Amino acid sequence: GIYPFLAGQIIVGCCQRPSRDIFKKCLLTRKIVLSLPENFNWDDDKEADFCRSYCDKINEELCKNEFIKKQGIRIDKILLYKTDGNKEITQDRNGYKNSGTAKIQSEMTDEEQLMVRELCSKNMLDNEHYLIKDGSLEYNPSFTNLSQTEWNLLRSNYKHVVGVSKMFNPDLLKDFNGHKLSKTIANLKPFERTKVYRYQAVNKDSEFAIWYVRLRKSEFRETHFSDVVKCEMVLEEPGALIDTDLINIISANIIKEAFPVCYGKDSRWANHLYPIFLTETYCKSNYLGQDILLNLF
């Protein structure tokens, strides 16, 4: 068979705002990874050993190029994707490509969680310092390149993390009367939030507190959900509650950050939070140009 070799850039970044007037970079992880078919390990060596030694060989060759050596560009990791045992992989024309891409995406979500762990280990998150994570906090344990034990331990780092999603399914939850929540969300007044709802992860491994906030007054919004964000926090144990005052403080701070400075630059501007927009911009500025990446191979 013909198997694709895939390369991906992974950038995970975090910025901090020590005061209203100061916004600065905090952490950045940048990796270039290769996703290769598992049968590329032709000697059936232990996967980790094979990937490490082959990665070293590639970097040895790359360093012969003066520009690459000077810029410190290197392949950080080799991932091996599945090539059999699954009809979706073997029968779909793009099956191998999808399998390889999934490996790279899993590496990215792993790095997101490892960055949260690093913030916790540096005592940067507490009752006075919360992390706003762009997107959902729901991670699927089936899509990880970490061991199950290591992945499970990462979930304990999310006490002071709030996931904020610009795009969401308004019909994900039902209200306390069993009706779809989409109508309640659509009818939110400016700066109003919904009640907080308990949501169990699809894989049943964790529970979340979820609520929705309308960020601004907008007479010309495209849809009823254009300036609404979905907020979520991990519940530390089944049945746990989060104090209403804390939810209100978090919601108020999120509303304060909703400056539409990226209007016209991003179709999601109505749902944007300014610090997230700046952090996204910071991360994008650290990507290698496509020409440089392609010329590595």
PLM region spans:
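Short beta-strand scaffold segments in enzyme catalytic cores
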Residues: 10-14
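Two-metal-ion RNase H-like nuclease active-site motif
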Residues: 1-3, 15
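Short coil-to-beta strand junction motifs in C2/discoidin
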Residues: 6-7
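Long, contiguous domain-sized segments
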Residues: 20-297
